Amino acid sequence: MKPSTGNNPAPGYKKYPGHSITTKPAGVRMRVTFKGEVIADTKDAIALEEAMSGSTVAPVVYYIPRKDVKMDRLVRTGHRTHCPFKGDASYFSLKNGPENAVWSYEQPYDEMSVIKDRLAFYPDKVDSISAA
């Protein structure tokens, strides 16, 4: 990831220069199911992978466009977290399901603008996240 030249640069890259984030189109159809219902279905997911000094530090996370998520199945919560590379995350619970199962970087740092208007799901809080 190259340093930002915009107005909202990620501070994490200065503090942790060995950390990298790669994003690319998933290239496959992604579906998320919960209680047997498809709650997200897209051919436009972004795969995000984080590494530190060349070693992967977390599983790939798929960010799905909001337009491809059944937003009426989600309830926004007050939970927030901060990532020095991506920005502030907002969370959603699944209706009649686990709390804070979904997150979104609604105003991500410049370097992560590709995940704006997208949602990610915790795999252990849904039935499946599958690629077809």
Label each residue range with its predicted role.
Residues 1-132:
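Terminal leader/tail segments of proteins
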